[in-house]
Amino acid sequence: MRIQPRLYPVSRLLLGVFVLIATSVYSYNVHAGPDQPPIPRGVAMKSWQENGRDGRYLLQVLQGSALKAAVPVTGTVKNDTDCDADAEGLSHCHNTIELANGTRITVINTHNMHRNRCLGDGDLISLTGINGSWIMGSLFRK
């Protein structure tokens, strides 16, 4: 005759709850580093070190209206400021972008400028809202 401990079902339940909580916390935001903003869910980027690769930039709107999700808008970069690197080698550049309708937004571009270039004055960029204040920008090839 096998004797089954009474706590066995309770321990399985607790383990299951722990796994669910850990999975949901991890999947909500990809780990970005202690002093960096979290990378939004659904963005195919694991680290801010990758931001700007192949001319694709994840940007956070600092001033101006957030863009609608999945609606591309064209803009022209007007400036590039505040690009000093932090302890992790990441710059948090501020860029003003003039949109096709004449309005302007200011974004934060967190990236490693030694790996991927800053957005520059005159760059033509396609912007698409992701969620909240997050937008994805893709440079047009010159």
Language-model features, listed with the residues they occupy:
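N-terminal intrinsically disordered, low-complexity, charge/repeat-rich segments that act as generic
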Residues: 2, 28-58
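Bacterial N-terminal signal peptides that target proteins for export
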Residues: 3-17
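Structural detector for short beta-strands of small beta-barrel domains
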Residues: 40-44, 55-91
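N-terminal post-signal-peptidase region of extra-cytosolic proteins
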Residues: 81-83, 105-115
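OB-fold (S1/OB) nucleic-acid-binding surfaces
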Residues: 86-105
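Short nucleic-acid-contacting surface segments enriched for D/E, G, S/T with interspersed K/R
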Residues: 112-128
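OB-fold/S1-family single-stranded nucleic acid-binding modules
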Residues: 131-142
